[in-house]
């Protein structure tokens, strides 16, 4: 059952990049992110209420939510959505798979109990070679939109890595769904007024495919995905759950190719193999 849930989670998160690619064709980035965070927050509030849980009132916890909601929600969601205006959804899902590699590097310098080993060093090198292969065409062309889009996705991975490290100590002892709700709430607080002030999306009229993709991204890719994610953690372990990292880019690449006719070039496939090998090594 846990394996089935893990496969479903990988499929859902892999499809998120497809939905984002469809949405950014018509919807401003900040509006996309603000709408996603707002609807997801309201849905998780409802889940908390029906389950008898509630958000904490501790100022210390809300300071943590404020930091993690910015670095782990508002910023990476915006970077991913902005980046996908210029690169394929499959490439975005693949570059996002570098998160565990960044986590290993940051953990070595920011924690006392996670030291880097030779296997992890090799994994980091292999993973970054994979990233370099993917970004080489853009580097040859200079700082164009394609390269900046790739850098935005890599930046979001760095944000997620930092969030994972600090969340362990700052949110220790908190029920996972409560923590997720707190972070989403603060992400909404940041992005909703920002969107209203900058995008002014008052007369926005998205097409039906874009609206459907936005709803699926929010409900399926955020709310349902979080519920499944924390269910797996409760039933098995965090280590088992992190195996989803291997599933997401494969699904993302396949969906991009099948739905949007994105090309699976030898460069992309080579980068996929090296990044996943790097992730495997840093987890040994």
Model-derived segments and their meaning:
Residues 23, 32, 36, 83, ...:
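Hydrophobic/aromatic residues within transmembrane alpha-helices
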Residues 44, 66, 106, 119-138, ...:
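Hydrophobic transmembrane alpha-helices of multi-pass small-molecule transport proteins
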């Amino acid at each position: 059952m846990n394996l089935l849930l893990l496969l479903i989670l990988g499929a859902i998160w892999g499809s998120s990049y497809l939905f984002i690619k469809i949405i950014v064709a018509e919807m401003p980035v900040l509006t996309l992110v603000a709408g996603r965070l707002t609807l997801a927050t309201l849905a998780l509030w409802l889940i908390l209420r029906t389950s008898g849980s509630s958000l904490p009132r501790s100022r210390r916890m809300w300071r943590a939510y404020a930091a993690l909601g910015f670095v782990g929600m508002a910023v990476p969601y915006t970077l991913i959505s902005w980046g996908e205006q210029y690169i394929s959804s499959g490439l975005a899902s693949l570059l996002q798979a570098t998160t565990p590699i960044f986590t290993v590097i940051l953990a070595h310098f920011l924690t006392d109990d996670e030291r880097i080993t030779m296997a992890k060093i090799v994994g980091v090198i292999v993973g970054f070679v994979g990233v370099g292969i993917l970004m080489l065409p853009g580097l040859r062309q200079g700082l164009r939109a394609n390269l900046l889009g790739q850098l935005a996705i890599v930046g979001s991975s760095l944000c997620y890595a930092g969030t994972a490290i600090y969340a362990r100590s700052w949110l220790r002892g908190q029920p996972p769904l409560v923590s997720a709700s707190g972070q989403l709430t603060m992400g909404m607080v940041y992005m909703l007024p920002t969107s209203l002030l900058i995008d002014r999306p008052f007369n926005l009229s998205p097409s039906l495919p874009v609206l459907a993709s936005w709803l699926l991204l929010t409900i399926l890719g955020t709310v349902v995905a979080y519920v499944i994610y924390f269910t797996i953690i409760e039933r098995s372990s965090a280590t088992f759950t992190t195996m989803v990292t291997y599933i997401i880019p494969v699904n993302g690449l396949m969906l991009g190719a099948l739905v949007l006719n994105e090309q699976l070039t030898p460069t992309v496939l080579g980068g996929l193999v090296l990044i996943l090998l790097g992730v495997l090594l840093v987890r040994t």
